């Protein structure tokens, strides 16, 4: 009887261990549509996969920029609304194993290359482009992020293609010169501005104007430098600037607002500052670009600056 009891306890312990192991794999019964969770170390755990899945519900796929690699993997591209527009656009990428649908944690996405064909002149140029895609959130490593800021929209005058290289678990793949449509934004939403310093042309891309509300807001932008040759994506400028901002309300006596701080260069290459918007309506944000010595290199003083963004909140 004692032997039987001991055997029962051993079997119970084994069963409990097996149940706990299974729970570790699927993490208390998490189920995700189209995804099978296994003990594959290349892929996300159930909890990680759920985070990725939830994030992907907030963006939309760009089918023409998705691809298959080596018959085993898929790479999918997304933007916030599944399309592109003038100015700053974020691009997100995930890679999956076809066998399970699960998200691969580590893969590389490089050489993002947007190219415009100017039809009448039969010439080509690129546009400001972010660096190689990288995990934008430490909690969601399987989602890689980069960006493109389009200087022109698609029209009879010209069309856009986009290419990139992918490396997934040692296997190479690419999307090459896929046609994309870049839509024009409504009047008053020209959030990509250019300026010259000597013979060099720079582009200032405003990132987050749709997120602003009354009160204090973080203002974020990127400064890119036109490449030579111009068919090469315009990388972030290595030079350092300071961007003073002066927000005004042209429909309300051109009054300003207090407690704004300049955009200064961050470790990730972006420029960030603070803008304080005291009420709803149209704001014209004049900006003055200064070099490291404080000399004005573009724009002008305060509301006299010829460079500005219009933002309505």
Question: Where are the regions that the model predicts?
Answer:
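Short acidic/polar inter-strand loop motif in beta-rich domains
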Residues: 99-100, 167-175, 282, 290-304
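Short flexible loop/turn segments that cap and initiate beta-strands
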Residues: 89, 97-132, 224-261, 299-305
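C-terminal motif of bacterial Sec signal peptides marking the signal peptidase cleavage site
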Residues: 15-18
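Surface-exposed beta-loop interaction hotspot
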Residues: 153-219
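Acidic/polar, low-complexity intrinsically disordered N-terminal segments immediately downstream
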Residues: 20-120, 309
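Sec-dependent signal peptide recognition
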Residues: 3-10
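Aromatic sugar-binding surface patches on proteins
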Residues: 134-150, 158, 264-274
């Amino acid at each position: 009887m004692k032997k039987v009891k001991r055997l029962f306890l051993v079997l119970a312990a084994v069963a409990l261990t097996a149940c706990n192991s299974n729970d570790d794999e699927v993490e208390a019964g998490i189920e995700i549509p189209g995804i099978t969770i296994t003990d594959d170390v290349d892929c996300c755990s159930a909890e990680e996969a759920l985070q990725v899945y939830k994030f992907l519900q907030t963006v939309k796929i760009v089918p023409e920029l998705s691809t298959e690699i080596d018959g085993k993997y898929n790479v999918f591209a997304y933007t916030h609304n599944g399309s592109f527009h003038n100015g700053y656009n974020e691009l997100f990428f995930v890679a999956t194993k076809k066998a399970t649908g699960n998200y691969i944690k580590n893969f590389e996405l490089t050489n993002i290359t947007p190219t415009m064909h100017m039809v009448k002149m039969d010439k080509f140029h690129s546009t400001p482009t972010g660096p190689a895609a990288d995990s934008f959130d430490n909690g969601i490593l399987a989602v890689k992020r980069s960006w493109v800021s389009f200087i022109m929209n698609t029209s009879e005058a010209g069309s856009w293609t986009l290419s990139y290289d992918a490396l997934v678990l040692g296997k190479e793949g690419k999307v090459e010169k896929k046609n994309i449509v870049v839509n024009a934004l409504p009047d008053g939403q020209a959030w990509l501005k250019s300026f010259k310093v000597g013979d060099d042309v720079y582009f200032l891309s405003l990132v987050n104007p749709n997120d602003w509300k009354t009160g204090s807001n973080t203002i974020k932008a990127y400064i890119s430098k036109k490449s030579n040759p111009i068919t090469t994506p315009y990388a972030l400028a290595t030079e350092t600037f300071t961007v003073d901002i002066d927000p005004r309300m042209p429909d309300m006596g051109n009054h300003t607002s207090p407690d704004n701080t300049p955009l200064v260069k961050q470790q990730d290459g972006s420029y960030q500052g603070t803008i304080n918007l005291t009420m709803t309506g149209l704001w014209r944000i004049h900006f003055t670009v200064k070099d490291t010595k404080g000399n004005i290199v573009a724009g002008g003083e305060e509301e006299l600056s010829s460079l500005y963004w219009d933002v309505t909140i």
